């Protein structure tokens, strides 16, 4: 059984990923390039050139789980500007899954409390 309630870290690999890759081909860059270990608290997302499909890689404690989502219409708003592993907040992850950009320019940004006097 997949328990995503344990996921605390949502990572996306920015740029393009060859979507022909399966589990071993996706685990390799996570561990070798980015020095990240697979665990039950992390979900890794990959997107190809067409931006209409993503793969999610997850470790459930006994083995790797590979999830695949293909949109029937529209495209994911995927950051293409650099090859890196980006950590998302839960809100950014929801935005991405809802078809929005993770870099919302109109969303309220966290601020610091001001003085009252």
PLM features: residue spans?
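Polybasic/polar functional segments that serve as interface/processing modules
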Residues: 1-117
């Amino acid at each position: 059984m997949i328990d995503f309630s344990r996921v605390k870290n949502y990572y996306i690999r920015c740029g393009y990923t060859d979507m022909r890759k399966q589990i071993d081909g996706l685990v390799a860059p996570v561990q070798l390039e980015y020095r990240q270990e697979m665990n039950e608290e992390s979900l890794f997302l990959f997107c190809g050139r067409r931006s209409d499909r993503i793969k999610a890689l997850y470790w459930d404690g006994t083995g790797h789980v590979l999830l695949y989502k293909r949109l029937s219409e529209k495209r994911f708003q995927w950051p293409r500007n650099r090859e890196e592993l980006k950590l998302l907040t839960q809100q950014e992850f929801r935005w991405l899954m809802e078809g929005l950009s993770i870099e919302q320019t109109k969303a309220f940004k966290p601020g610091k409390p001001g003085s009252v006097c």
